[in-house]
Amino acid sequence: MQFRVLCLFMFVSAISCSDKSSAIVSDTKTDEPAKKPVQSGSQKKGACFTTKNAAWSSKVSALNVYWHYSWGVDANMKEPDSVRFVPMIWGKWSVEKSLLIVDSLAKVGKVKHLLGFNEPDGKEQANMTVDESLAFWPQLMKVNLPLGSPACVHADNDWMKGFMAKAAEKGYRVDFICVHWYGGANSQSLLDHLKLIHNLYNRPIWLTEFAPADWSATSPATSKVTKAMALTFMQQILPALEKMDYVERYSWFSADPGSAALGNSALFDTAGKLTLLGDYYSKF
């Protein structure tokens, strides 16, 4: 994936590309805790917003999701009622300290799963070798939560294949595969990719970041993925994901509406209101 910037925080609240980065931190209004219980029609549907986004809590609530992750480990007190927080160990920084937080949350039942490193195969993301990632892996396993794999730029690349092969040799536990996908507005292409990943690793899948994108676009207006195409894609893919037994969770990535590559796939407009796409996701 191209056009990335590095976002490192003490407890690591990061994302996967520069278009995405600007989208997540652009809100300026102060958010208030979302206290109204959220009832999602799906126990798979999720949201990904860093808590550095001022309006993250209200956005998570507006999307009516079952779960949320922030690329970090803190279960913020503003988490909407009935939404399950899922922590992530983003990279190699402060792993031990982050895991102490996760362990404390797990012991009181606040978290039930743990996500592995964010795009360690990306130089502008976690940027870790396979062996380096494996060296930390026993610490993640020790928390004794269902553990998601590193979420690679491409889950079928040599980095991921090497990690899974060496993890198997060492007897390390990887309970489900985290997948990122930013292809065009072709739902069958994504379904084929998920089938490939499942066949490769024989694990359940969490589709933790996905949205149709045009990486050659210079503005949303020039994108080959129009808003209408993004909506059609969503209308096709969400019911299909619900029917796939091995897809346990999914989370649409909502970029800044001004993003050239991903703006037409945004769930919120510049005023922070649901787009037509966001309204469909919320009601699904």
Regions found by a protein language model. Name each.
Residues 106-130, 136, 148-156, 172-181, ...:
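Active-site groove signature of glycoside hydrolases
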Residues 14-40:
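Bacterial Sec-dependent N-terminal signal peptides
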Residues 41-45, 63-67, 81-85, 109-113, ...:
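Loop/turn elements at helix/coil->beta-strand transitions in domains of secreted/extracellular proteins
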Residues 42-114, 131:
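N-terminal carbohydrate-binding/catalytic regions of secreted carbohydrate-active enzymes
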Residues 5-12:
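Sec-dependent N-terminal signal peptides
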Residues 57, 99-103, 130-144, 160-164, ...:
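Generic structural signal for well-ordered alpha-helices
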Residues 70, 87, 118, 160-220, ...:
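Aromatic- and acid-rich polysaccharide-binding/catalytic face
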Residues 25, 81-91, 199, 224, ...:
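Aromatic-rich peripheral "rim/lid" segments of glycoside hydrolase catalytic domains that contact
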